[in-house]
From Swiss-Prot:
Its EC number is 4.1.3.3. The active site is at Y137 (proton donor), K165 (schiff-base intermediate with substrate). Pathway: Amino-sugar metabolism; N-acetylneuraminate degradation; D-fructose 6-phosphate from N-acetylneuraminate: step 1/5. This is N-acetylneuraminate lyase. GO terms for cellular component: cytosol. It is an enzyme of class 4 (lyase). GO terms for molecular function: N-acetylneuraminate lyase activity. It catalyses: aceneuramate = aldehydo-N-acetyl-D-mannosamine + pyruvate. Aceneuramate binds at S48, S49, T167, G189, D191, E192, S208. SUPFAM superfamilies: Aldolase. Catalyzes the reversible aldol cleavage of N-acetylneuraminic acid (sialic acid; Neu5Ac) to form pyruvate and N-acetylmannosamine (ManNAc) via a Schiff base intermediate. Signal peptide: none annotated. PANTHER family: N-ACETYLNEURAMINATE LYASE.
Amino acid sequence: MEENLKGLYAALLVPFDENGQVKEEGLKAIAKNAIENEELDGLYVNGSSGENFLINTEQKKQIFKIAKEAVGDDVKMIAQIGSLDLNEAIELGKYATELGYDALSAVTPFYYPLSFEEIKQYYFDLIEATQNKMIIYSIPDLTGVNIDVDQFGELFNHEKIIGVKYTAPNFFLLERLRKAYPDKLIFSGFDEMLIQAVISGVDGAIGSTYNVNGKRSRQIFELAQQGKVDEAYQVQHETNDIIAKILELGLYPTLKEILKYRGIDSGLPKRPFAPFNEENRAALDELVNKYNL
């Protein structure tokens, strides 16, 4: 197992201006906030929380570069390169590897109903081209792709496929994976189910709300690992109250607005996402003040 990659990661948010361009200084500040203020172990860059599937190849490269330069070489870095265009994914993977990212990750190909053999070859092609370590990004609610225990085994047979970012509510499958593949990394991808994932034996977690609520997430992770389940649940309950309100107000716009309370130029969501609704400002003020966000 890649012990050095265990831990808690921010699924990095990306600030955009009104024209959909990346705000470089804002991105640096968001990256530094995750490590220095939220005390996380690393960054997961260009995933769903970075609105990755709304941006072009050059913007993805720009984000990889800025994020890496912002936090330096001592921070764990995972580059999400998944794309429906295999050539783009390879190009991004080579670029992130050259920048010194510790591992790559790639969402399962979506939209087209591919066979498992086609999906497996997609990952093998990425590894062959980049020669970097790979973490499968499984998020079936958004991709429609469900991989079973035996199919994960076929993927994990490749020595460079070191684990999975598991963003699914199926804890039976998670338990089966943990039992079957004890030497592979499993990262939880659902912030609101962190305690259940830790009890199931995950090695770390990657989350969007960790950008603003990372310290509570670490409390949950460490308390649950220590067997202090009741205490961990108290923090998870509080965290889920926060998450429920953020989801009600709009996930990405609200996370970015919370960062603005910290003086970070966190910009706008990328269209077609709508900006934060100012009619919800009083509710957000209350949330930030109540939970010291």
